[in-house]
Regions:
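Glycan-recognition and catalytic cores of secretory/periplasmic carbohydrate-active enzymes
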Residues: 1-443
Length: 443
């Protein structure tokens, strides 16, 4: 049924028969490559995924071991490039050597992840690596203040992208907070000004960049609002703060009664990825917290609860959902699963929501079991794949760095059961429009 929904939306709703053909052709070519001896390690990985999933459940390595392996992989992904950026990811079937060039967008928000990790675990090497990333981002920033879409490219090949700019702005905010170096504040202010000028009268960002569909404004761009609001507070810029709130108000105009958001995918908005659903929910929630907007937080809770309730018995989530929250893909988008868990853990941290804690833990239990802590190819060890199975429909056949980034964020979340046991949640903001979550005993 999930595959039937995917085909229906691909052919009849999105009208993308050509894209569907090329996706199948690319999948066929990747499977053919797996027969070649140089890809033996990945072929073994593909053949043994289900067996290993059960073995990981039986072994149950500690979260500390998983977290350390994931952080080590990000460090390896940075070292795999000739600059201080982080490789887009490891895709042995797609490029010689497996490693793609540095990717400005996700290097940007990895800065925040690594600085948080460095502070929590007293890792000066990770702090230095993160600040080097922030310096590199400033070096490749476009004259307009924007950040380029796609992997790093020479100036004459760069095209600006609002979303990518927002994610690097997030990194510059964190780098400035950690170092108080003026160059990070200057780069961030330039990026924030680009984002403000890129917004239309309705509050939507206009510049998608060259690597996503151009026919619509993207709801998930509202995540830029969080970084904009952070910079507004650092720079004392009220205009920027108003723009951040307007970006989320615009996104909420596209939320349906079910909690689902329209125009919310890289390329197939009738069945968005959990990846872009996660981006939107994080943006709505975090701006709601900083701006003290209970309506934003309630909207995020509604969407988050609706999608997390759709998890399968093993904790996995379908990679795509239609407007009625019907599963529309049979693969799991592991990135999106981690992102949704991150937002859920933030809800629990601030508001003490036990039901969301249970749901997020189930999702992360599945994702953890897909992580390899040993193997013949060290470039796979510690990373999280784009999809489960790895030849599924998101970032097929490889390990995008942002999947591991959100895995780290989820595992490094506060020790939530301890916080809950101590009593009152941290945040005193009252959710006047939130309805109670469902009773898990009924699911």
């Amino acid at each position: 049924m999930e595959n039937i929904r995917y085909l229906y939306h691909s052919l009849l709703v999105e009208g993308s028969a050509r894209a569907l053909h090329w996706n199948f052709a690319a999948s066929r070519d990747r499977k053919a490559k797996l027969r070649r001896p140089e890809f033996a390690a990945l072929a073994h990985h593909v053949a043994s995924e289900d067996v290993r999933l059960k073995a990981e459940a039986d072994a149950a390595p500690s979260d500390d071991a998983r977290l350390a392996a994931a952080v080590a992989w990000v460090f390896r992904a940075q070292q795999a490039t000739p600059d201080a950026g982080v490789s887009l990811g490891y895709f042995p079937l797609d490029v010689e050597g497996g490693w793609h060039p540095s990717y400005p967008e996700t290097t940007g928000y990895l800065i925040t992840t690594l600085l948080d990790y460095a502070a929590q675990y007293q890792r000066a090497d990770m702090r230095n690596a993160a600040l080097a990333m922030a310096d590199w981002e400033a070096e490749v920033q476009m004259p307009s203040g924007a950040v380029q879409g796609g992997a790093v490219a020479p100036p004459d090949k760069q095209t600006p992208a609002a979303f990518n700019t927002g994610m690097v702005l997030d990194g510059w905010c964190s780098a400035y907070e950690a170092s108080r170096e003026q160059r990070f504040l200057d780069a961030g202010i330039a990026a924030a000004r680009f984002l403000v000028t890129d917004m239309d009268e309705a509050g939507y960002f206009r510049t998608n960049g060259a690597f996503v569909s151009q026919r619509e404004t993207k709801t998930y761009n509202c995540l830029c609002g969080w970084a904009m609001l952070r910079m507004a507070r650092l720079a004392g810029d009220q205009r920027l703060e108003r723009a951040a709130v307007e970006a989320v108000e615009a996104a909420l105009k596209r939320q349906r009664k079910s909690g689902w958001f329209a125009n919310n995918c890289l390329g197939m908005s009738s069945i968005p990825l959990t990846h872009t659903i996660g981006y939107t929910l994080q943006g709505v929630f975090e701006v709601g917290v900083l701006a003290e907007r209970p309506d934003f937080i309630a909207a995020a809770e509604h969407g988050l609860t609706s999608v997390l309730r759709k998890q399968r018995r093993d904790g996995s989530l379908a990679g795509r959902f239609d407007k009625r929250w019907n599963a529309a893909a049979n693969f799991a988008c592991l990135t999106g699963s981690c992102q949704l868990a991150v937002v859920a853990y933030r809800f629990v941290e601030l508001f003490g929501n036990r039901d969301l804690l249970i749901l997020a833990d189930r999702v992360m239990s599945f994702v953890k079991r897909t992580q390899r802590l040993a193997g013949d190819d060290p470039n796979m060890v510690g990373a999280i794949a784009g999809s489960y199975p790895i030849l599924g429909g998101y970032m097929t056949g490889g390990y995008p760095n942002w999947a591991t980034k959100y895995f780290i964020d989820a595992l490094a979340a506060p020790t939530l059961p301890v916080n809950l046991a101590r009593g009152a949640p941290r945040c005193t903001l009252r959710l006047s429009v939130c309805s109670p979550l469902f009773n898990l005993s009924e699911s």
